[in-house]
């Protein structure tokens, strides 16, 4: 793995950001479905609660809808930061949101690592296996991606010519061609 504090290039930041934002948006969508009263994939609200949280917690709209809003805001923050959308202040706020996402995922991954050892969890319960196979690995991987994104500066990358939300990275050759064209236009207008 690379150093998590090394900033990402623009193209990789967009890929990482899209992946993390999609995970968070998908999580928000699943919680919105649960807020309707559906307990998929479990048979009951209690079974769902134990599979997801290893505790009996009410899966009611009062609990789930604020969580949906938080996850949606987190997804938007990561997407805005990674795709360099908006003005400088918007991007700074989005970077802070991305750092918060990284911190939250790191915290959940740490708790998951403890639960993998069997501390505070029944190793025969569905939660243990979901945590081992799905929850903790996802938090480690996406937390790493969010940490790398949070380390990526708000300023536009020097590899782009426009400085704002590039469609793709500009190659050195393309930049040289653009400079020559601008010079020719300047000569034409000036002379």
Region locations from a protein language model:
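Actinobacteria-biased recognition of intrinsically disordered, low-complexity terminal regions
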Residues: 1-16, 153-191
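Cytoplasmic juxtamembrane regions at transmembrane-helix boundaries
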Residues: 9, 78-100, 159, 163, ...
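Individual transmembrane alpha-helices with interfacial aromatic-anchor signatures
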Residues: 96-100, 124-142
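Membrane-water interface at the C-terminal end of transmembrane alpha helices
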Residues: 137-157
